[in-house]
Amino acid sequence: MGNKSLAEKIAELSKPSTEFDIEDNDLRDNVFDHNGDDDHSNSDSSDDETLKKQHYLAVDKSNIRNENGNLNLGKAYGGKVTSRGDLYESDEESRSLDEHENSEDSDSGISLKTNSESESEDDDEDESESEDKDEVTKEEDSNLTHKRSKLKELMSNERQHIVNRLSQSASNDAVKGFAILQQHKLFDSIIDSRMKVQKSLTNSNVLPIKRDILKGHFATKKTDKYLNQTSEKCFDLLDSILALRSKLLKKDSVLSSSESPKSFNPKKRTLTDYLEATGKQDTVLERYRSSVLSKWSSKIHNAAGSTAISSGKFKAINQSAEQQVINNLSDMDRLIKRTKLNRRQVKPLGYEYHTSQSDITEQGSIDDQNQDIPNENKQTNKSDLSELASIFDDEDFYRVLLNDLVDKKIQSSDPASGLTVSLRSVQQAQKFKKNIDTKASKGRKLRYHIQEQIANFEAPRGGWKWDDNQIDEFFASLLGQKVNMNEVDEDEDHNNDDDEEIVINSNDSFKLFG
């Protein structure tokens, strides 16, 4: 392009050429120019086309097109060479035909009338259908509200039933818990009274066995008075025990009003009368005891399920609680014999333990044969656990009661003790992984276990007693030499140069470090 003159430059500045923006053009076509005239739109479109191509540069055909202008690709790719202008003109012609047909339809009045009539008929049908639908929806709504009300009523009834059942179960649990607490209190009171009686029971075993021994060695002027007072107090205690038992039998409805025994109040109280009264109460209690034991044992087995059955399958005593009690009480001789064992080594007044003369001679012969062995003051187990017919000692049963009481107190004060602790320890042991030393395999690490100190391996014996000669011989032979440490007279000391005669080690000497 050549240089422009000053007048041309001024003219360009006075009439600046509008720049074309594609986004502004599309916005104007879609929003602002939808109501414009056709002529105006056509002129604008032509101006837009010129503006679109104004910045184009004239470019010659490429070398590829020049070289492949007459390229024959076959029948499949056959066609006619056309320009873009011809294609766009055909599209514009089709658009103009469509617009012309639409204008003809709008100009015809008959078509408008028919369309209006058809539309009115369609509106009537739509109104009738909408009315029918409204009626159906109203019926459905009414049915739905009825169903909802029924469902709410059922849910409220079920909720009320659940609440009543929970409250009833809670009240039953509260009653059961209160009954258990009362049973524990009664058991504690009985154990407390048994603990108070234990000391007097132990002291009663110290009394003389025979009345002659009492009168001959220990009786005083007030002995008969004290004996009578003690017997009266014992009878009073028996009366209170019988009254308590009868009261408990009535409370537990074991006895009816007609079967209730008369109050035991004899004019002259003897031991045989009390034995008869307690025997009657025992026969009445036996029926109640058997029913209660069978009832609760079956309940415990049912609650435990298969675990109780499997645990008791291989036991030697696979019997009910009632049968076990009957078996234990049937062997009454064995039970009485256990009460005659002198566990506390009580020595009644006027009674002396003694050993037979044969035991003494036998022990003397053994000591003569083994002179080097120190004498041992043996106390036979017969004297420790001898049977005395005049004592009553149920310490084994008393210890069982005390252990049960202590365990119950510990569990009530600390719920995390006893069985709970063992169960938690087992669960924690199962959770934690075992600490396995992987480096100890294939002999790469020496395995060893530290042995604990041997303590209390054998209980010390207090009956060992050495004489002076044995003690001197022991200390003289500590270093593997035997020294004669016998005392000599002063005259022999002057004659002998050494105070002690050292003898070379012999085969029969006692060695510790030789």
UniProtKB/Swiss-Prot annotation:
Note the Pfam families from the entry: AATF-Che1, TRAUB
Biased amino acid composition, Polar residues: 354-378
Keywords from UniProt, A to Z, are: Nucleus
Per UniProt, subcellular location reads as: Nucleus, Nucleolus
Region Disordered: start and end of each range? 14-153, 353-382
Gene Ontology BP terms: maturation of SSU-rRNA from tricistronic rRNA transcript (SSU-rRNA, 5.8S rRNA, LSU-rRNA)
Acidic residues composition-biased segments: 118-134
Checking InterPro entries in the record gives: AATF, AATF/Bfr2, AATF_C
GO (cellular component) term, any one = nucleolus
Entry keyword Nucleus? yes
Q: Which portions of the chain have biased composition (kind: Basic and acidic residues)?
A: 25-42, 135-144
The similarity comment for this entry is: Belongs to the AATF family.
Instruction: Quote the PANTHER family the UniProt record gives.
Output: AATF PROTEIN APOPTOSIS ANTAGONIZING TRANSCRIPTION FACTOR (PTHR15565), PROTEIN AATF (PTHR15565:SF0)
Q: What is this protein called?
A: Protein BFR2
- Gene, per the UniProt record: BFR2
